């Protein structure tokens, strides 16, 4: 049976971050036929440097990231917002995925960004930045997925059925864009 693979790029390195918990919820509650894989090791990536992005010399964590994203059908960034923008770890991952020039692992893949953070706008600017960077890297950004959730004055947003329903709806939308992009057999 074939399935749709969605890889998740996490913008937070904290083991118990709300954004990791969102990713785990999507992984655990993904509908039949959809596999959600959380990419681990983004913190191990060196900062992008064209001088080490040379065939045969690419660092192992970078090769693994490119292979995992390249084999996926869709990409979902789940991220907080740091100082009004996306975290450096996510920006760096997108930088590595965008290269080598003309061979981006993100090229043509449906991409969305969402998440939660304890700010008034819930990470909106971070998500906009991630979508813009992914677009430049060649991804097909799914514009109708926009969940930037504020956690201010909310004890556990993952205990809110309405919020989890919105997350699962976003996953379905992302997967449907991937299916539309597949050529007819």
PLM feature segments, named:
Residues 2, 7, 140-185:
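Glycine-rich phosphate/pyrophosphate-binding loop and the adjoining helix
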Residues 2-34:
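N-terminal beta1-alpha1 ligand-phosphate binding loop
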Residues 6, 19, 23, 62, ...:
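A general structural signal for well-ordered alpha-helical segments in protein cores
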Residues 11-12, 41, 116:
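Cofactor-binding loop segments of dinucleotide-utilizing enzymes, especially the Rossmann-like FAD-
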Residues 28-35, 104-105, 138:
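Short helix-capping segments at alpha-helix termini
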Residues 34-43, 47, 140-149:
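Short beta-strand elements in bilobed, periplasmic/extracellular small-molecule ligand-binding domains
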Residues 41-58, 154-156:
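N-terminal beta-loop-helix "entrance" segment that forms/cooperates
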Residues 57-137:
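Helix-loop-strand module that forms the ligand-binding subsite of alpha/beta enzymes
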């Amino acid at each position: 049976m074939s399935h749709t693979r969605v890889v998740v790029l996490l913008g937070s390195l904290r083991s118990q971050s709300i954004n990791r918990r969102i990713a785990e919820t999507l992984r655990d509650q993904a509908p039949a036929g959809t596999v959600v894989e959380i990419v681990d090791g983004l913190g191990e990536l060196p900062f992008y440097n064209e001088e080490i992005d040379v065939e045969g010399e690419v660092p192992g964590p970078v090769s693994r990231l490119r292979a995992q994203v390249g084999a996926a059908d869709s990409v979902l960034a789940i991220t907080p917002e740091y100082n009004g923008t996306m975290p450096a770890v996510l920006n760096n991952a997108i930088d590595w995925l965008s290269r080598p020039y003309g061979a981006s692992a993100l090229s043509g893949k449906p991409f969305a960004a969402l998440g939660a953070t304890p700010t008034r706008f819930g990470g909106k600017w971070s998500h906009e930045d991630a979508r813009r960077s992914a677009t430049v890297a060649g991804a097909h950004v799914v514009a109708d997925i926009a969940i930037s959730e504020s956690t201010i004055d909310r004890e556990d947003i993952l205990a809110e059925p309405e919020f989890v329903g919105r997350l699962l709806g976003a996953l379905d939308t992302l997967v449907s864009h991937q299916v539309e992009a597949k050529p007819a057999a």
